[in-house]
């Protein structure tokens, strides 16, 4: 299954989750798109609930199904902690996500583009792989030639707050994942147990 690249507002309404992080998609119409609007919510089966929760989490990070599933498999190999939370931490440690959390991009999709285009450095070296796994303490910065890119500067200015598990210097346009996040600091709207149940049946 390929990565979804269609209208994020329509997809957000379908999932009942803001994919842009602004919540504007759901402000006026918090029901699935289509002719029947609010009356179009049908009761889901157990499998349907698990699938819907998996899709919510996958679309939140903007990943294709294969990449998302492979990361889940990696999480199953971590011996400490719970599988669902370990999976979410691996998602959070992706470079594109850390760039987004630092406020260098307004969305994860935009953050992925910045990484792909070579705007981002990790410990002073250019990394253009969005899935690169960031370790706590590694310095994420903007390449010198990219420091005046309008979209980056606008994102930094528009960012009102950052998670407690990252640090950021707006003057230097650099920051770091200072520690791994706690469960209550990420995706409170997601029930990761349903995602685990879904893949336990599939793998």
From Swiss-Prot:
Gene Ontology MF terms in the entry: rRNA binding; structural constituent of ribosome
Domain S4 RNA-binding: 93-156
GO BP terms, alphabetized: ribosomal small subunit biogenesis; translation
Protein keywords: Ribonucleoprotein, Ribosomal protein, RNA-binding, rRNA-binding
Tree of life domain: Bacteria
SUPFAM superfamilies reported in the protein's UniProt record: Alpha-L RNA-binding motif
Record's GO cellular component terms: small ribosomal subunit
Pfam family, one: S4
Assembly and interaction partners: Part of the 30S ribosomal subunit. Contacts protein S5. The interaction surface between S4 and S5 is involved in control of translational fidelity.
Function: One of the primary rRNA binding proteins, it binds directly to 16S rRNA where it nucleates assembly of the body of the 30S subunit. With S5 and S12 plays an important role in translational accuracy.
Family the UniProt entry places it in: Belongs to the universal ribosomal protein uS4 family.
Entry protein name: Small ribosomal subunit protein uS4
Organism: Streptococcus pyogenes serotype M4 (strain MGAS10750)
């Amino acid at each position: 299954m390929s990565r979804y690249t269609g209208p994020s507002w329509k997809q957000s309404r379908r999932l009942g989750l803001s994919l842009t992080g602004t919540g504007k998609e759901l402000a006026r119409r918090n029901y699935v798109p289509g002719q029947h609007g609010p009356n179009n919510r049908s009761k889901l089966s157990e499998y349907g609930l698990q699938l819907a929760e998996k899709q919510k989490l996958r679309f939140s990070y903007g990943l294709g199904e294969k990449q998302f599933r492979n990361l889940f498999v990696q999480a199953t190999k971590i011996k400490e902690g719970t599988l669902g939370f370990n999976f979410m931490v691996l998602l959070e440690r992706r470079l594109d996500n850390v760039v987004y959390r630092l406020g260098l991009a307004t969305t994860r999709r935009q953050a992925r583009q910045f990484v792909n285009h070579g705007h981002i450095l990790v410990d002073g070296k250019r990394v253009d792989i969005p899935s690169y796994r960031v370790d706590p303490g590694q310095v994420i910065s903007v390449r010198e030639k990219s420091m005046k890119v309008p979209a980056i500067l606008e994102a930094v200015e528009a960012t009102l707050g950052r998670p407690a598990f990252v640090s950021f210097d707006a003057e230097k346009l650099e920051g770091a994942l200072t520690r791994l996040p706690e469960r209550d600091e990420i995706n409170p709207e997601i029930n990761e147990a349903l995602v685990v149940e879904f893949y336990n049946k599939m793998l």
